[in-house]
UniProtKB/Swiss-Prot annotation:
This is UPF0114 protein Sbal_0780. It holds the Pfam family UPF0114. Keywords: Cell membrane, Membrane, Transmembrane, Transmembrane helix. HAMAP family: UPF0114. Belongs to the UPF0114 family. The keyword Glycoprotein does not apply. The chain crosses the membrane at residues 15-35, 53-73, 109-129, 136-156. It is a multi-pass membrane protein. GO terms for cellular component: plasma membrane. It comes from Shewanella baltica (strain OS155 / ATCC BAA-1091). The keyword tRNA-binding does not apply. It is found in: Cell membrane.
Length: 164
């Protein structure tokens, strides 16, 4: 009975596989939004102001960072919790594939969230005249929380890895 239960539990990790595959659909949706923004920009390139262009650029960078985060979670999550990716050993293989454990994945995700939050906060500051001070304060507090959380997670990971 115990062996059957353990095998069933171990096999249940495959439930995560379609979820990781579903993230690729979100990645596709982000790509569509990215190019939609570019196609809206092109006809108006000579009419758009500098600040609006910078805000749009920050939005595109934001989408790119989120896309990178999705790729990182998709691949390393699949490798850590479902099965090893067998993509061959050619030049196309990502250098970090197979080398990122759950702890380092958490740190990379936290760093990505801080970067995304930084871009969003920069967009808020560039548009500060249209945003209430209360909202700016909350954006700043949330960003500081992300930064402190990422720092704490990195520090705890360092402590557990060194055993000190």
């Amino acid at each position: 009975m115990e062996k059957v239960f353990e095998r069933l539990m171990y096999a249940s990790r495959w439930i995560m596989a379609p979820i990781y595959l579903g993230l690729s659909l979100i990645l596709f949706a982000l790509g569509v939004k990215f190019f939609q923004e570019i196609f809206h920009l092109l006809p108006n390139i000579f009419k758009i102001g500098e600040v609006d262009l910078v805000l749009l650029t920050l939005s595109l960078i934001d989408i790119t960072l989120v896309g990178g985060l999705i790729v990182m979670v998709m691949f390393s999550g699949y490798e850590n919790f479902v099965s090893q990716l067998d993509v061959g050993e050619d030049n196309d293989k990502l250098s970090w594939l197979g080398k990122m454990d759950a702890g380092s994945l958490k740190n990379k995700v936290a760093a990505s969230i801080v970067a995304i939050s930084s871009i969003h906060l920069l967009k808020v500051f560039m548009n500060a005249e249209n945003i209430s001070n209360d909202k700016i304060m909350w954006y700043l507090l949330i960003h500081i929380t992300f930064v402190l959380s990422a720092f704490a997670m990195g520090y705890l990971d360092k402590i557990t890895r060194t055993g000190k």
